[in-house]
Design a protein with these regions (language model features):
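PLP-dependent enzyme catalytic core of the Aspartate aminotransferase-like
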Residues: 117-118, 126-127, 141, 145-148, ...
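Conserved small-domain helix->loop->beta segment predominantly found in fold-type I
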Residues: 272-275, 279-281, 286, 290, ...
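Glycine-centered tight turns that cap/initiate beta-strands
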Residues: 74, 146, 314-317, 402
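Short hydrophobic/aromatic beta-strand micro-patches
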Residues: 221, 345-347, 407-409
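Conserved PLP-enzyme active-site core in the AAT-like
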Residues: 7-16, 78-311
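Conserved N-terminal alpha-helix of the aminotransferase class I/II PLP-enzyme fold
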Residues: 37-89, 111-119
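Short loop segments at secondary-structure junctions
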Residues: 32, 223-226, 348-351
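N-terminal "arm"/small-domain region of PLP-dependent enzymes with the aminotransferase-like
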Residues: 1-59, 67, 404
Length: 428
């Protein structure tokens, strides 16, 4: 559906009903699938034929939604996972192994920071974290001979820094490695990282894509542009025979358009299991169908609240790239011309005590760990999502102790501003 707009892809990509078939995608709630002969099933296990044999690896409902997300991002292949964390782990571990190295932006979601800095380190995969504002020279200096990928978030959670995707992609490609970008906050409605040079795009579909706080999920999209065989020495998992699949070499058999997702499905999903359920995929698709309508409203509310907060005497600073005063405004105009998202972060004069009083006084904004929902919610990340970080790490990640992250939902912006104003008045 390359010729169609993003809105049309949100509604119709991935599934075309045949004559007399369901207009809505079917939920294939089955663990397994029947075949007439052992030979037919054997072809699936040999990756010689397309089809399904066990829903831990693939399911028709999940594949339908994955195809839609691939079309929305402009990729050649995609897969769903059980969560955004699973998507990021699979995307990185698919091309990394013990002894390898990652270069990652320091301004990322706390759970992802911990995944890279602690959990993957236990697997023998080390990382160097760089500022999202690092110069080309500084980025180059972070590379080692064993570096296998770069990672960053289009809009960081919760610092809301904006990644210079084009620069990160340029440096990554000069070193012969792919750039993986988590595009959760802007969604492909507001930014498509592949158009700026990213090779792999990940999502927590739990957020805006679902949009209603109803289903957990993640997604990985492959651009199909990175030439794995041109860097075969770096990526033996893709470019040498896989003994667990009869000696298949993924990059040779499936080409650069299909090797990454095929290996991720056939190998990692087989061994680790984190597949999204068909029911969750169905509900995710319902969210995707209205994503292009919802995102402008989230951006509108985010912009209105950011402007209100910027002029309030009890607010020390506001992080929102839609504000002309924001350090990322010019970069956002490049990558996010239609706006980024509905998430605003800000610091209150008075530190943690003021933050606590503010959140306690909110009526429309619920205190919860979720973000990017139809309903407004808020959080103090230093005491919740990022509490595993020490003070130095919090500073590097752009998450000081007084920071509040507020995710503006789809309520009326006048009511939201009034509620926030009343909560600010409660600070003594």
């Amino acid at each position: 559906m390359k010729e169609y707009s993003i809105g049309t892809k949100c509604v119709q990509a991935g599934y075309a009903a045949g004559n007399g078939e369901p207009r809505q995608i079917p939920i294939i709630q089955s663990t397994t699938f029947k075949y007439d002969t052992s030979e037919d099933m054997g072809k699936l296990f040999d990756l010689e034929a397309e089809g399904y044999f066990y829903s831990r690896l693939q399911n028709p409902t999940c594949d339908t939604v994955a195809r839609k997300i691939a079309a929305m991002e402009g990729g050649t292949a995609a897969m769903l996972t059980s969560s955004g964390q699973a998507a990021n782990f699979y995307a990185m571990f698919n091309i990394c192994e013990c002894g390898d190295h990652i270069v990652a932006s320091s301004s990322i979601y706390g759970g992802t920071f911990n995944l890279i800095a602690v959990t993957m380190a236990k697997m023998g995969i080390t990382a160097t974290f760089v500022s999202p504002d690092a110069t080309e020279e500084e980025l180059n200096a972070a590379f080692r001979p064993n570096t296998k990928l770069m990672f960053g978030e289009t809009i960081a959670n919760p610092a809301l820094t904006v990644l210079d995707i084009e620069l990160f992609a340029k440096v990554a490609h000069e070193h012969g490695v792919p750039l993986i970008v988590d595009n959760t906050f802007p969604t492909p409605v507001n930014c498509r990282p592949i158009e700026w040079g990213a090779d792999i795009v990940t999502h927590s579909t739990t957020k805006y894509m679902d949009g209603h706080g109803a289903t957990l999920g993640g997604a990985i999209v492959d651009s199909g542009k990175f030439d794995w065989m041109a860097h075969a020495d770096k990526y033996p998992g893709l470019c040498t025979p896989d003994d667990s699949y009869h000696g298949i070499t993924y990059a040779e058999k499936f080409g650069k358009e299909g090797a990454f997702i095929t290996k991720c499905t056939a190998q990692l999903m087989r061994d680790f299991g984190s597949m999204q359920s068909p029911q969750n995929a169905f509900m995710l698709n319902l969210g995707l169908e209205s994503l292009h309508v919802r995102m402008p409203k989230h951006v509108e509310n985010g912009q209105a609240v950011a402007e209100f907060l910027e002029n309030h005497p009890k607010v020390a600073y506001v992080n929102y790239s839609g504000l002309p005063s924001n350090k990322y405004y010019e970069r956002a105009q490049k990558y996010l011309p239609n706006g980024g998202c509905g998430v605003v972060s800000f610091g209150l004069k008075g530190g943690r005590e003021a933050a606590s009083a503010f959140m306690k006084a909110l009526r429309l904004g619920a205190i919860e760990t979720h973000v990017a929902d139809a309903r407004t919610c808020c959080l103090n990340p230093a005491t919740s999502t990022h509490r595993q970080m020490n003070d130095e790490q919090l500073k590097e990640a752009g998450v000081p102790a007084e920071l509040i992250r507020i995710s503006l939902g789809l309520e009326d912006k006048v009511d939201l501003s009034a509620d926030i104003s009343n909560a600010l008045d409660a600070i003594k």
